[in-house]
Amino acid sequence: DFGSAQFEQEYMCSFEAAILGSFYGTELAAARSEGRICDVAYDPDLPVMTVWDIGYSDDTVILFVQIIANEVRIIDTYSSNGQNLAHYAGVISGKPYEYSRHVLPHDAQAKTLAAAGRSVYEQFTKDYDLKNVTILQNRNTEMQGILAARHLFSRLWIDQGQEDFLNALGQFRREWDDDKKCFRDRPVHDWTNHFADALRYLSWVWKEPV
């Protein structure tokens, strides 16, 4: 609870205690205790789907996902910033995976002046020949997406080597209202958002036929 987590963090210097206000702290703890954060190897008999959060001036995050029955396996992740689309296309082609589709966020269809009036979607499909690229429409609010991701968590298996992703999910948290002495119903916007957004998009994909 709030009191014990705060005590462990401040007085016992515990890094295992849930971050105060964490959206996914309980779900991460359950995944660890149930052995779902482990060595999740690539299965060459299954296709890989990628789910993206694209940052234009900051981080881009890619999740590499395999789905079998009710298991949603995050086998790999990639993040970087300040890179062009050719870089990310190279990351995709450089992996040993067979892909089913690449899911981009809704803003990837926006046309930009810097790209001569072309969208990220158009550049990926025409310049870099990525196949089966789809756009995830923005159907839910951020908080609805976070709730959907929490529901998805019981099906998640996450490769333990994806430390940045796991750390981001653990630190993704609500804003604190110092006047009212309570957490606001919206997240802190920092480096954790890009990883959390990619998970949120994955939770929307899970509801669709895959």
Regions of interest found by a model, annotated:
Residues 41-79:
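Acidic, glycine-rich loop-and-beta core segments that form the ion-binding/anion-interacting portion
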Residues 63-190, 207-210:
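Mg2+-dependent endonuclease catalytic cores in nucleic-acid-processing enzymes, primarily RNase H-like
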Residues 194:
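Histidine-centered active-site/metal-ligand motif
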Residues 21, 203-204, 208-210:
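Charged phosphate-binding loop/patch that engages nucleotide di/tri-phosphates or the phosphate backbone
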Residues 3, 9-12, 16, 67, ...:
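Residue-level marker of positions within ordered structural domains that often coincide
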Residues 1-54:
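ATPase catalytic-site recognition across NTP-hydrolyzing enzymes
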Residues 24-25, 43, 58, 140, ...:
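Poly-acidic low-complexity segments
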